[in-house]
Amino acid sequence: MSSYGAALRIHTFGESHGSAVGCIIDGLPPRLPLSVEDVQPQLNRRRPGQGPLSTQRREKDRVNILSGVEDGYTLGTPLAMLVWNEDRRPQEYHALATVPRPGHGDFTYHAKYHIHAKSGGGRSSARETLARVAAGAVVEKWLGMHYGTSFTAWVCQVGDVSVPRSLRRKWERQPPTRQDVDRLGVVRVSPDGTTFLDANNRLYDERGEELVEEEDKARRRLLFGVDNPTPGETVIETRCPCPSTAVRMAVKINQTRSLGDSIGGCISGAIVRPPLGLGEPCFDKVEAELAKAMMSLPATKGFEIGQGFASVTLRGSEHNDRFIPFERASCSFSESAASTIKHERDGCSAATLSRERASDGRTTSRHEEEVERGRERIQRDTLHVTGVDQQNGNSEDSVRYTSKSEASITRLSGNAASGGAPVCRIPLGEGVRIRCGSNNAGGTLAGITSGENIFFRVAFKPVSSIGLEQETADFAGEMNQLAVKGRHDPCVLPRAPPLVESMAALVIGDLCLRQRAREGPHPLLVLPQHSGCPSC
């Protein structure tokens, strides 16, 4: 079907070369501030024609909000969004009316429906994912405002080129930000195509090997402008936050494209600060829902969470995530956990706040104004923020408490003004007192979120529509030589992170509403982030 979700339901519609593509979101809470500007950035990251290594289909992908929003706030009614297809060329696919493309859905769609969309694959085209990204952007804003949850995905492998394992393991604990992914993954190519420049201004030859001779580096650096790109220079978005690996990926994709072929790879995804307790035993476990969502994306062929398939080489004593006291786990936090509300009243507890709630679930304490804003006040006198390691692209964004007495768990939820429950802070002495000291499980235990970051990987196969001539049979069983025309990505990976982020947001959003239906006025629990320390 074309719908996903139980409490938060998403429906998408439209074909690749039809008039438009769109989505309907049903179940979204009311009073969420929302505008086109909240959705468009993610669509821009997914948009075709971003560079020479993606499809040259030119689409503006400007989103239109048709219903469900008034005066800048959601109404709680179905929210509909639409994007018009402007660069349609169905005539390029006439030859495919009788010859199904190898690896594509032409044959199976025809077998199922006894008809298939000949132009670009119809619903099986990656164009359909535009609607998912639009829906995911909306849900992502709601989750960010109410729970501080964020989503990041990045390219970790293209063909046999992958991010170093040591860096991958570090990102599992402290993922790169979306800004890091976009900035550090940029690769510039000289007009003659012989020299590559990464985000750290390091130079590479046409094979992706870093230049070491100073004379050669000085000569080739003249090929690039200092402040503005040189005429004829090419900018490639790889969305790999390791600059040196990004260059090798760009070289690999460029080589594949020149052959008229395609190549696949893997996307790593991270859900930072997911609420604790999400997931429904036994068939709607959080990893089962994520796997279903990711495997519903076009071209996906594999999914793993935590250590995944690598866990088969470990013993239980190595793979188990042992629990540790919260004080030891809270020595350092990511920037997403920097915002905290501090109730100045001595001995503030969940029970105390609960007694003060009125029948509508609102808090009647003297901190009501702060709570209702749904914004957590930053305790800048107790925080220390570090930056990003520019050399290897590793995200070092972290916020560390200078006093252990400040370490605590936070209960976060939507505020009353935005259709949710209030926000409160719980001292360490009450509620959850332990957390996982490691995260081999990837943020879930028995299919329920543990409060730790959820990290996973998604494998994408090579694009099936390629320019190389292939010998294949038509629907009548006659052999033909087929070279697919049209505009297609030689590798979908650079445009795939927004897809993965959006599907993850739709899964977590649906599970949050399902858990809230069970919990009633009680806010969901969210743990602050820790990046590990010697004592842990």
From Swiss-Prot:
A biological process from GO: aromatic amino acid family biosynthetic process
Cofactor(s), by name: FMNH2
Highest taxon listed in the record's lineage: Eukaryota
Enzyme Commission number(s) of this protein: 1.5.1.38, 4.2.3.5
Pathway: Metabolic intermediate biosynthesis; chorismate biosynthesis; chorismate from D-erythrose 4-phosphate and phosphoenolpyruvate: step 7/7
Keywords noted in UniProt: Amino-acid biosynthesis, Aromatic amino acid biosynthesis, Lyase, Oxidoreductase
Cystine connections: none
InterPro entries linked to this entry: Chorismate_synth, Chorismate_synth_AroC_sf, Chorismate_synthase_CS
GO-annotated cellular components: cytosol
GO molecular function annotation: chorismate synthase activity; FMN binding
Keyword Lyase found: yes
Region (Disordered): 37-59, 344-377
Catalysed transformations (reactions): 5-O-(1-carboxyvinyl)-3-phosphoshikimate = chorismate + phosphate; FMNH2 + NADP(+) = FMN + NADPH + 2 H(+)
Pfam families on file: Chorismate_synt
SUPFAM superfamilies, A to Z: Chorismate synthase, AroC
Catalytic residues, chain numbering: H17, H104, D489
Function recorded in the entry: Bifunctional chorismate synthase and flavin reductase. Catalyzes the conversion of 5-enolpyruvylshikimate 3-phosphate (EPSP) to form chorismate. Acts also as a flavin reductase (FR) able to generate reduced flavin mononucleotide in the presence of NADPH.
HAMAP family the UniProt entry points to: Chorismate_synth
Family: Belongs to the chorismate synthase family.
Name of the protein this chain belongs to: Chorismate synthase
Lineage: Eukaryota, Sar, Alveolata, Apicomplexa, Conoidasida
